[in-house]
Amino acid sequence: MSATDLDPEPDPESSKGQIRQANELLILQAAEKVFARAGFGGATMAAIATASGLPKANVHYYFGSKEVLYRQVLAQILSDWLAPTRCITVDAEPRLAIEQYIRAKMALAKLRPDGSKVFANELLHGAPVVKALLQTDLRDLVASKAAVIQSWVNAGRMARVNGTHLFFTIWAATQTYADFDVQVCAVLGNSSLSLEDHDEATEHVVSLVLRGCGL
């Protein structure tokens, strides 16, 4: 008996699950791009299907409607934005934690600019889809992380800053490189942001925020 004789037979259901996950990811990535360029109103399931390279029927099969897909895209963007806050804990070194968070946000601005634009456009229209998430998940997380920052302030580990407004400042400073990249490029005289431009911007934001925090 060979070793391969002992290998379990491939599970068809497992394979189907992997295919579904791969297709859903393709569709979500395509939808992010289409929503960023056309907005919710201008986007169509046909355009998303074309961008994903999958039949339109598949897009409807996995997500049902444009509204469902849009909600899923927004929820995923918010989840990805909140994940980097894990480094902000009471026992963490304030300078390292804040720097790590800023660098993560700048990386997202570079790697997922379309996601940032979709979210910004949603907010500019009054957040009709994500308002509940903003008032619950986001508000609760910011409150808990602002409490961590306040504990650092109370312990004399950093300058006296308002933790909640610190997050607003970081979001504005990092997301501008995605949401307003056209403006940034125009002022810099470039057709697009180069790796050097992004690195310089990252170091600038890190330095500015850390100095403002007395770190």
Model-derived features: where do they sit?
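Amphipathic alpha-helical linker/stalk segments
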Residues: 71-100, 142, 148-150
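C-terminal peripheral helix-coil segments that are non-catalytic and often amphipathic
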Residues: 1-11, 107, 111, 139, ...
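Amphipathic alpha-helical segments used for helix-helix packing
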Residues: 110-132, 180-188
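N-terminal intrinsically disordered/low-complexity leader segments
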Residues: 1-22, 29
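Hydrophobic alpha-helical connector segments
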Residues: 86-117, 163-170, 199-202
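Helix-turn-helix
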Residues: 22, 26, 34-68, 72
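Hydrophobic/aromatic residues within well-ordered alpha-helical segments
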Residues: 23, 66, 73, 77, ...
